[in-house]
Amino acid sequence: KAVMLYFANMKIAQAFHPLLSSFEVILRNQLHYALAHHFSDGNWIINQKNGFMVASSLTHTNKRTKKQVTNRYLLTEVQKAEKKISDRGARITAGRVIAEQTLGFWNSFYEVHHYILLSGVPCTIFKKLPSGYGRKQVNDVITQVRELRNRINHNEPICFVNKKCDFSY
């Protein structure tokens, strides 16, 4: 029975792969176009390493430890991508850096701190959001898609709860 559930889960997971891949590519490309327009710079992902990715508003004092904490997630991910590209002996281009980024990277543009720095540009890629739907709701949906994608990629059960098929996840 367990083997049957495993293979059923695998088949369902396989069916999701094209959709999840398309979602990620479309989100990535649309965010790139919107941000390239916003910064009037097709190389924004490289050039903004000295711009919004290091803004002072990304630093705050941790209330518990009283230490300063700086969110350099986007900057760090861009630098990692550049190193990876360089280590392959390839020329660093905006297109290559963009292609190296994960869904988590793109998801982070909908976190409050980055969203504010970008003047709400990330939500402009969704032309027909329902009334009452904004940054938080978009972020929540992208996070859910990312979590589903991660469950699928790590061969975790995506629809079987207590040996029954349950798609409520």
Model-derived features: positions:
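Amphipathic alpha-helical interface elements
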Residues: 1-169
